[in-house]
Amino acid sequence: MTTRKTVDSRLLEWQTTCKHPVINLTPEKVDKLYHLKLKSESKNISSNRLLPISLSSLQKKMEKLFIKDKSHSHKPSLPDPKVPTLRTYKDGGFFISGKGSMKLPDIESAIHKFLWKKYGKGLVYCYGCDPTGKKRHTEWFNVPVLELPSVLRLIDSYCLGGESR
C-alpha cells in the first residue's frame, strides 16, 4: 500500500531506506520466472540419474496407453498458465478507485492474511532500517515460483472486490 505517485518511487524509497535491492514482480517478470522454472525443472527431471527412464521415453510409453484418434493426433502439452489480463494492474502495481466498499488498508490486510496463511511469513530482519537488525519487515511471503501467476490473479481479485461495480 502506498500513496506515492508511482510504484517505482515507492520501491526506490523502500530500497534507499532498507539498503537492499527490491524487485517489482510485474506480470511480465512473473511470466519469465515461471517459464524459466518450468524449463529448469524439466532439465532436472531429464538429467536425474535416479530415474531409470527418460522423460521422452516415458511420454512415448504413456501415449501407448491412450486410444489414438487419427483425425486429431497431437502430443499433449503441459498447461501454460500465462498471467491473464489483470484488470486492476497498471504502471507496475495494482490500483483501486477508492469508490468501492473496501478501503485500501482493508484490501491490503486481507491479501496479507491470505498469503501468510497459505505461504507463511517471510520475515526479513532489516539492518537498513535498524542497524541492530531488530526491525522486522513482515510484508514478505515464501511463494513458490510456479504459484506466482495465481498470486497475481488473487491480488487482482481482491482489488476488484474493492471497486464499485
Curated annotation (Swiss-Prot):
This is Uncharacterized protein YPL034W. The lineage of its organism: Eukaryota, Fungi, Dikarya, Ascomycota, Saccharomycotina.
